[in-house]
C-alpha cells in the first residue's frame, strides 16, 4: 500500500483477499480503472463482479455497482451454451471511490477463467435501432503476448452483441472490442485459459495426413451417422435422439442448419432462421432464437463427446422456403453469421453442402467463393468438407481439410476405398455409402450385414465410413432424417468395430498391400487387421506382406506375433493358441516358420487381428 493512502481503505478488504487467493495477480493500471468506472457499457468477467463487491465498503457513499441483466432466463454469467460470459455496467461508482482507487496501486485481479479449447464469450449492450444485423460491425481482438487473433462477433437480438473465443493456449489473455458503434468499440478485458478438464481433448484435426486426432493428441477414429434435421423436430423427439446417441457408438453426426423438405420429411420446422414466413422471409434479419436452439443442440452433442458436422447448405428445399436459391450476397451474409456464432464450439465441423452438385442455383465458382469465405472467416480453423451427389468436388482445394464423399461402390468391394487417398492426400470419409433400411429407393435398403461390411472395407483401407438408417415407420420418423430411435442391427456391430479401432495403433490404420492382398490393413510391422468379408474360408495361411515404401517397416525373420479371430457379425473375439514366428517366404511375404495356418469357422464377416510381441 502506498504511503499516505486514505484511512478509509486501510488494508485490502478481507473479501477481496479471499477472492484473489490462487488467482494470477496483475497490477491494475490507472487507465483500466478509468475504463472500469466511467464506461457504462463495459464488459467484465463473472469474477470481476465477485471481487468488486468488497470495494463498496471502502467508501460509505458508494452505491452498489449496477450489473447489466440479460433478458434471457439462464443464470447470470452463463448462457445456454454453458460458456463463461462477461457482462458488467460499472458506472455506479461515485467520485469519492474514484479518488481512492486512483491513489491505490493494489494488485487487483480482473480476470475470468475458461478451459483451454473451451469458449469465452464477451457480451455488450448496443444499438437496437435500424437493422443491427446490417448496420453494426462488431469483433474483438484477443491477444496473448505478441500474438493476437481477430474474431468476428454477431448480433443476438434484444440489444445483445456477442463475440466468442476458444483459446488454443493456456495462460493469460486480453481482448479489445472493435466496432463502428461507439458504445461497442474499444472495450477491454482479460481472462485466463486454464488446463482442460478430463473430457476436453480439444477440437479434432487432421493427423498423419490421412487420419484425425484431437488437439491434445488423443486419436479420433471417426464413426459417424447422418440425421439431417433431428435438431428441428421439437424438444421431445430431439431429446429422444440424444438419448439414442448417448447409447450408440457414433462419435460424429451430420445435420443441417436449414430445414429440409423431402420424402418422409414434409413437416414445417418449429421456427425459421430468418424473420418472416415461408416465401416471404427477410434474409437481412436473422431469428436469434433459431440459432440459439441450434447452439444448444451442438453443446448437447459436445457433452456426449460427439462431433457436430454441420451442413450449411442443401438442395432439399424445392422452393418451400427459398434457402436453396438465395443470392450470393444473401449466402455470404448467412454464412458469416453462422460461422461467427458457431466456430468457437470445439466439436463443430463445417460441411459446405450436402450433395452440392444437386443445388442447381449454384456454380462451381460459387462453391469456391463459399469455401474460401467459410475458411477465411473461421479464426479457429475447424475441419471443412463438401459432400457430393454424383459429381465429386475438387477435393485438392487448400481450404478443404478432408474429403467428404458419397460413394457406396467405393466400399462395396475390396481394393477401391484407398484409391481416393492417393488422389487427394487427405483423410477420406465416406459419409454416405447408402442406408440400412427397407424403403423402396435403392440408396435406402441395404442390409445391416452390408452396412457393417462397408465399414470394415473402409477401415482396412485406411479410410472412414458413415452410417445411416431408413426403416419405414407409421409415424414417418426415419433416423436418417428426423432421428428418434435406431431400429437396425448394424449399430451394435459398429460398436464392436469401435472397440477394435480404439485398440488399434494411434497413428491410424494403413492399407498394407493394395496391389495384391487388399483385405489387409494395419500398421506394419506391429499390427495387422485381416478382413475376409463375405468369403467363408475354414483356414488362413499365416503370412504377412511387406508394406508400400514409406508405410511402415517390413516384417523380418524372427519376429513373433499373436493372433485373434474376430467374428464381426456375432461380435466375438477368439484367441489363437501359440505364437507365430516369421520366416521369409519370398520377395513379398514372411510366413510362419512352421507353415502354420489359422483355423476359421467357415462363416462370412470374419477378421483376424495380429499383434507383434515386443521382445
Annotate the PLM regions.
Residues 132, 218, 436-439, 451-577, ...:
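Aromatic- and carboxylate-lined catalytic core of secreted/periplasmic carbohydrate-active enzymes
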Residues 141-209:
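Extended acidic/polar, glycine-enriched regions
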Residues 1-4, 8-9, 14-17, 21-22, ...:
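N-terminal basic, low-structured, amphipathic or hydrophobic segments
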Residues 145-152, 570-578:
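Surface-exposed loop/edge segments in extracytoplasmic proteins
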Residues 110-146, 151-154, 190-196, 513-521:
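Non-catalytic, glycine-rich low-complexity segments
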Residues 333, 354-481, 485-492:
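Extracellular glycoside hydrolase catalytic/binding regions
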Residues 196-414:
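Active-site mouth of glycoside hydrolases
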Residues 121, 156-164, 588-592:
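Aromatic sugar-binding surface patches on proteins
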Amino acid at each position: 500500500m502506498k504511503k499516505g493512502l486514505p484511512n478509509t481503505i486501510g488494508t485490502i478488504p478481507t473479501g477481496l483477499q479471499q477472492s484473489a487467493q490462487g488467482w494470477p495477480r496483475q497490477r491494475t493500471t490507472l487507465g483500466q480503472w478509468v475504463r472500469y468506472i466511467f464506461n457504462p457499457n463495459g464488459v467484465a468477467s463473472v469474477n470481476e463482479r465477485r471481487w468488486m463487491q468488497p470495494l463498496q465498503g471502502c467508501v460509505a457513499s458508494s452505491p452498489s455497482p449496477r450489473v447489466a441483466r440479460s433478458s434471457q432466463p439462464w443464470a447470470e454469467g452463463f448462457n445456454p451454451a454453458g460458456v463463461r460470459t462477461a457482462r458488467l455496467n460499472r458506472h455506479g461508482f461515485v467520485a469519492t471511490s474514484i479518488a481512492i482507487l486512483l491513489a491505490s496501486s493494489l494488485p487487483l485481479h480482473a480476470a475470468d477463467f475458461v478451459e483451454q479449447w473451451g469458449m469465452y464469450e464477451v457480451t455488450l449492450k448496443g444499438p437496437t435501432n435500424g437493422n443491427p444485423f446490417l448496420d453494426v460491425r462488431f469483433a474483438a481482438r484477443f491477444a496473448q503476448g505478441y500474438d493476437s487473433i481477430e474474431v468476428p462477433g454477431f448480433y443476438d437480438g434484444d440489444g445483445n452483441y456477442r463475440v466468442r473465443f476458444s483459446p488454443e493456449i493456456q495462460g493469460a489473455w486480453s481482448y479489445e472490442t472493435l466496432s463502428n458503434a461507439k458504445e461497442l468499440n474499444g472495450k477491454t478485458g482479460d481472462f485466463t485459459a486454464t488446463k482442460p478438464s478430463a473430457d476436453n481433448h480439444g477440437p479434432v484435426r487432421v493427423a498423419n495426413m490421412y487420419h484425425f486426432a484431437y488437439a491434445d493428441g488423443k486419436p479420433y477414429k471417426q464413426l459417424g451417422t447422418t440425421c439431417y434435421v433431428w435438431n428441428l423436430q421439437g424438444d421431445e423427439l430431439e431429446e429422444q435422439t440424444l438419448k439414442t446417441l448417448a447409447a450408440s457408438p457414433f462419435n460424429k453426426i451430420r445435420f443441417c442448419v436449414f430445414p429440409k423438405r423431402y420424402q418422409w420429411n414434409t413437416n414445417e420446422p418449429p421456427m425459421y432462421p430468418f424473420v418472416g414466413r415461408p416465401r416471404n422471409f427477410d434474409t437481412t434479419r436473422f431469428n436469434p432464437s433459431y440459432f440459439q436452439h441450434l447452439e444448444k443442440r451442438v453443446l448437447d452433442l459436445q457433452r456426449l463427446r460427439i462431433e457436430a458436422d454441420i451442413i450449411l447448405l442443401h438442395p432439399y428445399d424445392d422452393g418451400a422456403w427459398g434457402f436453396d436459391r438465395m443470392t450470393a450476397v444473401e449466402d455470404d451474409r448467412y454464412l458469416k453469421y453462422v460461422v461467427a456464432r458457431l466456430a468457437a464450439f470445439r466439436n463443430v465441423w463445417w460441411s459446405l453442402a450436402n450433395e452440392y452438385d444437386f443445388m442447381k442455383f449454384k456454380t462451381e465458382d460459387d462453391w469456391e467463393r463459399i469455401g474460401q469465405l467459410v475458411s477465411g472467416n473461421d479464426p479457429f480453423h475447424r475441419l471443412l468438407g463438401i459432400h457430393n451427389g454424383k459429381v465429386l468436388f475438387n477435393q485438392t482445394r487448400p481450404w478443404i481439410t478432408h474429403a467428404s464423399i458419397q460413394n457406396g461402390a467405393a466400399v462395396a468391394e475390396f481394393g477401391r476405398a484407398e484409391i481416393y487417398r492417393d488422389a487427394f492426400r487427405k483423410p477420406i470419409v465416406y459419409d454416405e455409402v447408402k442406408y440400412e433400411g427397407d424403403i423402396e429407393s435403392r440408396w435406402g435398403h441395404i442390409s445391416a450385414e452390408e452396412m457393417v461390411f462397408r465399414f470394415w472395407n473402409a477401415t482396412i483401407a485406411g479410410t472412414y465410413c458413415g452410417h445411416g438408417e431408413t426403416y419405414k415407420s407409421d409415424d414417418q420418423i426415419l433416423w436418417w432424417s428426423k432421428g428418434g430411435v435406431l431400429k437396425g442391427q448394424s449399430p451394435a456391430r459398429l460398436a464392436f468395430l469401435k472397440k477394435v479401432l480404439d485398440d488399434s495403433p494411434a497413428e491410424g490404420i494403413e492399407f498394407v498391400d493394395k496391389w495384391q492382398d487388399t483385405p489387409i490393413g494395419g500398421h506394419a510391422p506391429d499390427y495387422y487387421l485381416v478382413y475376409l468379408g463375405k468369403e467363408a474360408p475354414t483356414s488362413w495361411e499365416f503370412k504377412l506382406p511387406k508394406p508400400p515404401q514409406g508405410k511402415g517397416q517390413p516384417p523380418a525373420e524372427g519376429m513373433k506375433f499373436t493372433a485373434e479371430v474376430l467374428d464381426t457379425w456375432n461380435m466375438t473375439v477368439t484367441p489363437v493358441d501359440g505364437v507365430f514366428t516369421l520366416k521369409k517366404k519370398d520377395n513379398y511375404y514372411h510366413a510362419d516358420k512352421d507353415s502354420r495356418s489359422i483355423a476359421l469357422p467357415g462363416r462370412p464377416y470374419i477378421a483376424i487381428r495380429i499383434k507383434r510381441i515386443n521382445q
